[in-house]
Amino acid sequence: MRDMNDLKSELYDQLLNELPVLRARLGITQEVLALKVGCSRQTVNAVEKRKKEMTWQLFMAIIAVFNLDESTRKMLSDIPGFSEKLNMVLNEEIDR
């Protein structure tokens, strides 16, 4: 069984690699994303530039925003292994 922290780190990296493109697809700024997920624009900027670590709560909030739109939901599902890793982590969290 893979370490859940390693899986989360891989998920964070995969999301961060695509975050500017996902935001562009929705036509939203860092500020708008921040309002939607309940944090500051500075936090989104720092996380996107990898100057600050992403929390699991922020990760899930961002996923929720992009899951609402069909095109960005498809983009997330097209990231190799992303859905599988996310399901593994979520199933582990539920089983605790």
Role assignments for model-derived ranges:
Residues 49:
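Short, conserved catalytic or interaction motifs in soluble domains
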Residues 17, 21, 42-45, 57:
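Positions in alpha-helical segments
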